[in-house]
Swiss-Prot record:
Binding site for ATP: G621, P622, N623, M624, A625, G626, K627, S628
Function: This protein is involved in the repair of mismatches in DNA. It is possible that it carries out the mismatch recognition step. This protein has a weak ATPase activity.
Recorded GO CC terms: cytosol
Phylogenetic lineage: Bacteria, Pseudomonadati, Thermodesulfobacteriota, Desulfuromonadia, Desulfuromonadales
GO biological process: mismatch repair
Keyword set, alphabetical order: ATP-binding, DNA damage, DNA repair, DNA-binding, Nucleotide-binding
Organism in which the protein naturally occurs: Pelobacter propionicus (strain DSM 2379 / NBRC 103807 / OttBd1)
Pfam families: MutS_I, MutS_II, MutS_III, MutS_IV, MutS_V
Designated gene of the protein: mutS
MF (Gene Ontology): ATP binding; ATP-dependent DNA damage sensor activity; damaged DNA binding; mismatched DNA binding
Top-level taxonomic group: Bacteria
Family indicated by similarity: Belongs to the DNA mismatch repair MutS family.
Region (Disordered): 813-834
Protein name: DNA mismatch repair protein MutS
Length: 870
C-alpha cells in the first residue's frame, strides 16, 4: 500500500471495510470504482473500463459514472444481486489541504431500497429476517424501509417459515453468520438459493443486545411492552433486521415507529402450492399480475392502495367481525355509485404518501417530494366532505384516520415554491415571503445583476468599444471582455484578469466591489435556502406518525372503492360469512376467467359443501370439461369473501375456512431428485397432516402419476381418510378420472358424486360446463384428442384399441391391441404371455370357490358371472 498515492491508500482502506459491496468512491462530479469493482461494474453497467498508471507495471483498472445520474447504475447492480456502498466527500475540497476526507454514508442492498426509481410502485420491498430457535420455533421478521412497515411473528417448523416467506416475497433474506443452507429442509434450501441472502454477525443474535436495539428504536422500556413476550425467536429475528438496517443506512430511521406482532392464526393459511395454483397474485403461465386474481380485482388509483390490496389477498381474514366490516363498507360504496366515482377522482391525484413519508423521515426527500405531499393533502378536505355521510363502521373510522394535516399543508405551501428544482443546494426552492433575510439577500442579488447591466452600458459609452461585454464564470467571477482589435482603447484603470485567444478580460475596482457583494449574496442565498429547507423537512418529519395514519386510511379506502367498482361492473354479490361449515354458492363463476371475455359465455355453477351430507364432492368428467376451473372458482370465492370482497355469484354463504389446500398438477423437480408422483404424494401428505374440519381442500387427479391400480388405491384411501378422520373431515372437492371412486358414495355417507355434463352429437362431444349430480359414464379422451388436433389416423387407431379394451377382445392369448393392422403376425414365441387366457381365468376363479359357504343367491350370481366369462 505504501507505493500507492494518498487517494488510493484512502480508497483501499475504506474498501477493506466493505468487501462484499461495490464501492462508489466520490471524486468530484463522478463516482469512481477501482480494481475488481471496476472490472465487475464495467461489465454489468456496460461502461468504459480504463486504468490509472497506464503503461506501468502497476496499472489500476477503474471506471466511473456521473454523480447526478447515478441511480440507474445503482439499480442495475442491485438487480444483478450486488450491494453498493456510497462513499462521499464529507469535507469541502476548497477548504481542505491535502486529501479530502471520505466516508461511506450508506450501503444500498436489494432489501433496503428507498429511491422511487428503483422500486415497483405496486409492490412492497421487504427485507426478511429468519431465525431458527429452540424446538423448531422460527422467528420471522420483515420490514419495508421505504414505507416504515415492520412486522414479526413466530412459527412452528421450517414448512411454516417457508410458507410465510413465499407470501412475503422478500427482496432480500437475512440469516445469521454460520447458518448453513445445507442444514435446512430441501424445499426451504431451494427457496433461499433463489434469493439474495445476506448475513448478520452471530453475536447480534443475543437477547440482551437485540432487546436494547428494539427498545431504543421504539422508545419502550421492555420488548414485552411491544407484545414480544413469549416470542424469543421472533425477538432475535426483529433485532437482527434492525441491526442490519442501522449498519447499512448509517443514519436514523425515525419513520419506523412501531412493530406489529401478528399471529398466523389471524389469517387464512395458504401454503406455497395453493398460492401458486390459485394464481392469487401472479399467473402460473407468465408469473405476472395479469391473469391473476389480483390483476382481476385491482382498480386502485394509488400505489398505496395497490400494495394494500395485494396484502389483503395474501392474508385473508378468519375473524367474522373484520370480514363483515369490510363487506359492509364495500356494500355502501357499491350502492353509492356517484359518491364512489367522486371519491376515486379525488384519490387519483394523491401521491405515494407511505414512501414520501419514509423519505422525509430519512432526510432524503427533495423539494419536489414535499410539494407532492402538499398537493396530495389538498385533496383530503373535499374527500372527507364526501365521506361525511358514510354510515358503516369502517368508513366512519377511515374518515377519522384520514387527517387533513392543515398545519403541514400550510407550512409546505408557504415554504416551498410550486415547481422546485431538483437540486437542493443551488437555490430557487424556498418561496418568496417565507423568510425576511432570504428576501433581502435576493433583492441584493437582483439589484447587483441590474448594476452589472448598467455598468456594461456605461463602459461601452466611456471606452467607445461597442463589442465590450461583462462576462461571468465560476472560476474567475465577473470580468470585462475586450476583443484584441480594441485593446488600444482599454482605459488605464482596467486590471488584466485573463488572456484568451481572441480577447483579454479585465476587472475594475467598481466591478470587483459589486462582484463581492453579489456573489456573497448568491452563496449566502444557497446556504440559507438549504438550511430553511432542512428545517421545513424536519418539522414535517416530526408529524410522520400522522402522515402514516392518513396514508394507511387512504390506502384502505382505495381498496374498498376498487372492490366496490369491480363488484358493480361484474354483478358480484355480498357473501354471507359465518362460522359454520357450509359453503353454499348459487351460480358461482371463476372471477379471472369470466373477466377475460374469451368469446363464450361463462357457465355458472352451484356448490354445496358442509360438514353433514355433502362433505366431499367426488367430481368426474372428461378433460377440458371444466372440473379444474370449477374447483378453483370455489376456492377463490371463499378466499375473496374472507378478504372482504364481494364474490362472482348470484348468492353465497361462506363458512369461514382456516386453510385452503390445493393439490393439482405438478412437474418433475429433477434438481431435487423428485418425480411428479413424489411431489404429488408429498403435497397430499402435507394436506392430510394439516387439514382440519374448518379447512377447504381441492384435490385434482390424485394418484394419476403411477399405475392405474396404485392410483385408484391411493385416491380411494385419501378420500376415505378425509371422510373418516375426525381431526381432518374437511370440506373437499375431489376430481378424478378413476370412475371406481364414485362407488365411495355408496359406502361413505358424506360423499356425493357430481360430474360435468356432456352432450354427444354426430360423433362430436360438446362440453356443457355444468356440474350435475351423478358419475361420468365416459372419459371422452379420444374426443379431446381430436379437439387438440391429433392426426386422424391416430384418432381412428385409438378408437379401434378402445373397442378392443372395452370388449375384452383377445387373440392368441394376447389383447388385440398388441397387433397393428399394418404388422405381420409374429411367429409363435416360447415366451409366456403377460396376459392370462380366458380359460386360465376361469380355472383360477373356480379354484378359489368355497362351495360350502355360498348361499343360493350367491351361487346363482356366481354362475351368471362365470357364464359371461366363458
Amino acid at each position: 500500500m505504501a507505493d500507492h498515492t494518498p487517494m488510493m491508500r484512502q480508497y483501499l482502506e475504506i474498501k477493506s471495510g466493505y468487501p462484499d459491496a461495490v464501492l462508489f468512491f466520490r471524486m468530484g462530479d463522478f463516482y469512481e470504482m477501482f480494481l475488481d469493482d471496476a472490472l465487475l461494474a464495467s461489465r454489468i453497467l456496460d461502461i468504459t473500463l480504463t486504468s490509472r498508471n497506464k503503461g506501468s507495471g502497476d496499472e489500476i483498472p477503474f471506471c466511473g459514472v456521473p454523480y447526478h445520474s447515478v441511480t440507474p447504475y445503482i439499480t442495475k447492480l442491485i438487480e444483478n444481486g450486488h450491494k453498493v456502498a456510497i462513499c462521499e466527500q464529507v469535507e469541502d475540497p476548497k477548504q481542505t489541504k491535502g486529501i479530502v476526507r471520505r466516508e461511506v454514508v450508506r450501503v444500498i442492498t436489494p432489501g433496503l431500497l428507498i429511491e422511487t426509481e428503483n422500486l415497483s410502485p405496486d409492490d412492497n420491498n421487504y427485507l426478511l429476517a429468519l431465525h431458527q430457535g429452540a424446538e423448531e420455533q422460527w422467528g420471522v421478521a420483515w420490514l419495508d424501509l421505504s414505507t416504515g412497515e415492520f412486522r414479526v411473528t413466530e412459527l412452528a417448523g421450517p414448512g411454516s417459515a417457508l410458507a410465510e416467506a413465499v407470501c412475503i416475497n422478500p427482496a432480500e433474506v437475512l440469516l445469521a453468520d454460520g447458518v448453513r443452507l445445507e442444514e435446512f429442509p430441501a424445499d426451504l434450501k431451494e427457496y433461499l438459493a433463489q434469493k439474495i441472502v445476506s448475513r448478520a454477525p452471530a453475536w447480534v443474535y443475543e437477547r440482551d443486545y437485540t432487546s436494547s436495539l428494539i427498545c431504543d428504536q421504539f422508545g419502550a422500556a421492555s420488548p414485552d411492552v411491544l407484545g414480544l413476550e413469549g416470542l424469543p425467536s421472533g425477538l432475535l429475528a426483529a433485532g437482527a433486521a434492525l441491526y442490519y438496517l442501522r449498519e447499512n443506512r448509517k443514519s436514523a430511521i425515525p419513520h419506523i415507529r412501531d412493530i406489529r406482532v401478528y399471529q398466523r392464526s389471524e389469517h387464512l393459511a395458504l401454503d406455497p402450492a395453493t398460492r401458486r395454483n390459485l394464481e392469487i397474485t401472479a399467473s402460473m403461465a407468465e408469473g405476472k399480475k395479469s391473469g391473476s386474481l389480483l390483476g382481476c380485482l385491482d382498480r386502485t388509483v394509488t400505489a398505496m392502495g395497490a400494495r394494500r390490496l395485494k396484502q389483503w389477498l395474501g392474508y385473508p381474514l378468519v375473524g367474522l367481525e373484520p370480514i363483515r366490516s369490510r363487506l359492509d363498507a364495500v356494500e355502501e360504496l357499491l350502492e353509492g355509485a356517484t359518491t364512489r366515482d367522486e371519491l376515486a377522482a379525488q384519490m387519483k391525484g394523491i401521491a405515494d404518501l407511505e414512501r414520501l413519508n419514509g423519505r422525509i423521515g430519512m432526510a432524503s426527500a427533495s423539494g419536489r417530494d414535499l410539494r407532492a405531499l402538499h398537493d396530495s393533502l389538498q385533496r383530503i378536505p373535499p374527500l372527507r366532505e364526501l365521506m361525511a355521510t358514510m354510515q358503516t363502521a369502517l368508513l366512519c373510522q377511515l374518515t377519522k384516520e384520514i387527517d387533513p394535516l392543515e398545519d403541514i399543508l400550510d407550512l409546505v405551501g408557504r415554504g416551498i415554491v410550486e415547481n422546485p428544482p431538483f437540486s437542493l443546494r443551488e437555490g430557487g426552492i424556498i418561496a418568496p415571503g417565507y423568510n425576511p433575510e432570504l428576501d433581502e439577500l435576493r433583492s441584493i442579488s437582483h439589484e447587483g445583476k441590474g448594476f452589472i447591466a448598467r455598468l456594461e452600458a456605461q463602459e461601452r459609452a466611456r471606452t467607445g468599444i461597442s463589442s465590450l461585454k461583462i462576462r461571468f464564470n465560476k472560476v474567475f467571477g465577473y470580468s470585462i471582455e475586450i476583443t484584441k482589435s480594441n485593446l488600444a482603447s482599454v482605459p488605464a484603470d482596467y486590471i488584466r484578469r485573463q488572456t484568451l485567444a481572441n480577447a483579454e478580460r479585465y476587472i475594475t475596482e467598481e466591478l470587483k466591489n459589486y462582484e463581492e457583494k453579489v456573489l456573497g449574496a448568491e452563496d449566502r442565498i444557497h446556504e440559507l435556502e438549504y438550511s430553511l429547507f432542512q428545517e421545513i423537512r424536519e418539522r414535517v418529519a416530526g408529524e410522520g406518525s400522522r402522515i402514516a395514519c392518513s396514508a394507511s386510511g387512504l390506502a384502505t379506502l382505495d381498496v374498498l372503492i376498487s372492490l366496490a367498482g369491480v363488484a358493480d361492473e361484474r354483478g358480484y354479490c355480498k357473501p354471507l360469512v359465518d362460522d359454520s361449515q357450509v359453503i353454499d354458492i348459487h351460480d358461482g363463476r371463476h372471477p379471472v376467467i369470466e373477466a377475460m371475455k374469451l368469446g363464450e359465455r361463462f357457465v355458472p355453477n352451484d356448490t354445496l359443501l358442509d360438514g353433514g351430507e355433502s362433505q366431499i364432492l367426488m367430481i368426474t368428467g372428461p378433460n377440458m370439461a371444466g372440473k379444474s376451473t370449477y374447483m378453483r372458482q370455489v376456492a377463490l370465492i371463499t378466499l375473496m369473501a374472507q378478504a372482504g370482497s364481494f364474490v362472482p355469484a348470484a348468492s353465497a354463504r361462506i363458512g369461514i375456512a382456516d386453510r385452503i389446500f390445493t393439490r393439482v398438477g405438478a412437474g418433475d423437480n429433477l434438481s431435487r431428485g423428485q418425480s411428479t408422483f413424489m411431489l404429488e404424494m408429498m403435497e397430499a401428505a402435507g394436506i392430510l397432516r394439516n387439514a382440519t374440519p374448518k379447512s377447504l381442500i381441492v384435490m385434482d387427479e390424485i394418484g394419476r402419476g403411477t399405475s392405474t391400480f396404485d392410483g385408484v388405491s391411493i385416491a380411494w384411501a385419501v378420500a376415505e381418510y378425509i371422510h373418516d378422520t375426525p381431526t381432518c373431515r374437511s370440506r373437499t372437492l375431489f376430481a378424478t378420472h378413476y370412475h371406481e371412486l364414485t362407488e365411495l358414495a355408496a359406502t361413505r355417507e358424506r360423499i356425493r358424486n357430481f360430474t360435468v355434463a356432456v352432450r354427444e352429437w354426430n360423433d362430436q362431444v360438446i362440453f356443457l360446463r355444468t356440474i350435475v349430480p351423478g358419475g361420468a359414464s365416459h372419459s371422452y379422451g379420444i374426443q379431446v384428442a381430436r379437439l387438440a388436433g391429433m392426426p386422424a389416423d391416430v384418432i381412428e387407431r385409438a378408437k379401434e384399441i378402445l373397442r378392443n379394451l372395452e370388449n375384452g377382445e383377445f387373440e392368441e392369448g394376447a389383447p388385440r391391441i398388441a397387433k397393428s393392422r399394418r404388422q405381420r403376425t409374429p411367429d409363435p414365441s416360447p415366451q409366456f404371455s403377460l396376459f392370462e387366457s380366458d380359460e386360465d381365468l376361469l380355472r383360477t376363479r373356480l379354484k378359489k370357490l368355497n362351495i360350502a359357504t355360498l348361499t343360493p343367491l350367491e351361487a346363482l350370481n356366481l354362475l351368471d358371472e362365470l357364464k359371461r366369462m366363458a
